[in-house]
């Protein structure tokens, strides 16, 4: 196969407007360095004019800007427009690999485009990746109504089937068993490969002391306080009510602590209002990339009390990994794929833990801050975008070299790519878990 592989990554949002689309950009930037050629990203939910949204010189972003309807066909226009854009991008730029973020609906689009390109002798490798909402919103919560079933056919038509975490693979296989029994689950299990997210080199760059002082001054934070923070979407599933309660308790017992909740989301207005009643809590909305990095670096403990709600469970936790990359220990809920983003159980808190117990855990981390920080740094160092991109190159090359491309690539069972805590067990199927209530 061509040594200078060209990828076209299909993501819903532009690379600067969602976590997974940003991860796609990180991978594409690393792919450009590793291959020496420009990489491409196809997206269909908006174009931004924010200067921080620039994808960089090595990644070309192609936006679906026009969706033409057909009065005789009432639905499906957007998916057809995305497929048409992806087809043109692949054909006109000699793309070798289509890589998807989320299988729903991207696997079907990628397969459709690959089949069409095969008619003109240009079929690319298709790498389908199972991500967050694929697990619950597309599969586990739609087993009984039947809408999950076609997704299993979609993923098995690709050349490579990736999951963002071992937990994601297990839940997906449980859904497969519920629909098609152990035989279907075992067939898919043979083809699932892990490809963890990877952070760009900028994520490991420590801001200077002057930058940290300016950051604190700019946002009204005390220069001598001990910062406890979280950064991510301001949504119900992030468990931010727990952090509010922790800050409220600490206001009376640990005056040296200051708490920061940062990010964007639908709870922003409510959180700002609630923070007015908690003197040691600051809510920062729409922070810049620079300020986000300063917040992480200035923090003593990152806190992620994420929880399960209908339609959502963390299938990894890149936000925690970004803190760890700067040597900041974290405490995160032990749910879903979160344990795979943390070094060991000292960094995890069981679901249902009270705010007072969370605060006690924070105090325990502070008492061992240097050691925990060193562990966090070493662990996060495994998760680079270069390593994730190299994984894509290796998988695409192996898939292209097969004589039989009628089913997805099957890796050697001894594949030891990025084995993490907890110890990675063979992908065995079990009873499908009920949807969370």
Which residues are covered by each model-predicted region?
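Donor nucleotide-sugar binding/catalytic pocket of nucleotide-sugar-dependent glycosyltransferases
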Residues: 150-210
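Conserved donor-binding/catalytic core segment of Leloir-type glycosyltransferases
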Residues: 8, 162, 211, 216, ...
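Short hydrophobic beta-strand element within catalytic cores of glycosyltransferases
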Residues: 322-332
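Nucleotide-activated donor-binding/catalytic signature segment of Leloir-type glycosyltransferases, i.e.
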Residues: 269-291
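N-terminal subdomain of nucleotide-sugar transferases
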Residues: 1-49, 418-437
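Acidic donor-binding loop of glycosyltransferase active sites
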Residues: 297-312, 328
């Amino acid at each position: 196969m061509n040594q200078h592989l060209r990828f076209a990554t299909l993501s819903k949002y532009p690379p600067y407007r969602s976590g997974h689309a940003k991860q796609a950009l990180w991978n594409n930037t690393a792919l450009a360095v590793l291959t020496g050629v420009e990489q491409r990203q196809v997206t269909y939910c908006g174009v931004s004019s924010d200067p921080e949204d620039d994808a960089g010189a090595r990644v070309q972003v192609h936006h679906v800007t026009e969706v033409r309807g057909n009065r005789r066909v009432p639905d499906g226009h957007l998916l057809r427009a995305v497929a048409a854009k992806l087809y043109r991008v692949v054909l006109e730029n000699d793309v070798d690999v289509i890589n998807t973020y989320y299988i729903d609906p991207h696997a079907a689009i990628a397969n459709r485009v690959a089949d069409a390109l095969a008619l003109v002798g240009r079929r690319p490798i298709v790498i389908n990746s199972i991500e967050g909402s694929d697990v619950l919103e597309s599969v586990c919560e739609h087993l009984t109504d039947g809408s999950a079933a076609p997704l299993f056919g979609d993923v098995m038509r690709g050349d490579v089937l990736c999951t963002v975490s071992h937990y994601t693979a297990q839940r997906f296989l449980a859904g497969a068993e519920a629909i098609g029994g152990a035989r279907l689950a075992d067939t898919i299990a043979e083809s699932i490969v892990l490809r963890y997210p990877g952070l760009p080199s900028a994520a490991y760059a420590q801001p200077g002391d002057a930058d940290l002082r300016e950051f604190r001054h700019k946002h009204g934070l005390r220069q001598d306080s001990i910062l406890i923070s979280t950064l991510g979407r301001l949504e119900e599933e992030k468990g931010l009510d727990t952090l509010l309660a922790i800050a409220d308790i600490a206001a009376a017992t640990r005056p040296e602590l200051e708490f920061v909740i940062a990010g964007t989301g639908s709870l922003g207005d409510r959180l700002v209002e609630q923070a007015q009643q908690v003197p040691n809590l600051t809510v920062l909305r729409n922070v810049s990339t620079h300020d986000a990095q300063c917040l992480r670096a200035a923090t003593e403990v990152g806190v992620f009390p994420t929880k399960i709600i209908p339609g959502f469970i963390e299938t990894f936790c890149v936000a925690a990994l970004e803190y760890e990359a700067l040597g900041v220990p974290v405490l995160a809920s032990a749910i879903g794929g979160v344990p795979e983003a943390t070094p060991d159980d000292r960094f995890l808190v069981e679901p249902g833990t009270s705010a007072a117990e969370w605060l006690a855990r924070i105090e325990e981390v502070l008492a061992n801050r240097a050691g925990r920080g060193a562990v966090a740094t070493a662990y996060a160092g495994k998760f680079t975008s270069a390593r994730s991109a190299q994984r894509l190159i290796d998988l695409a090359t192996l898939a292209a070299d097969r004589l039989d491309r009628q089913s997805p690539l099957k890796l050697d069972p001894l594949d030891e790519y990025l084995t993490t805590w907890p110890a990675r067990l063979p992908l065995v199927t079990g009873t499908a878990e009920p949807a969370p209530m």
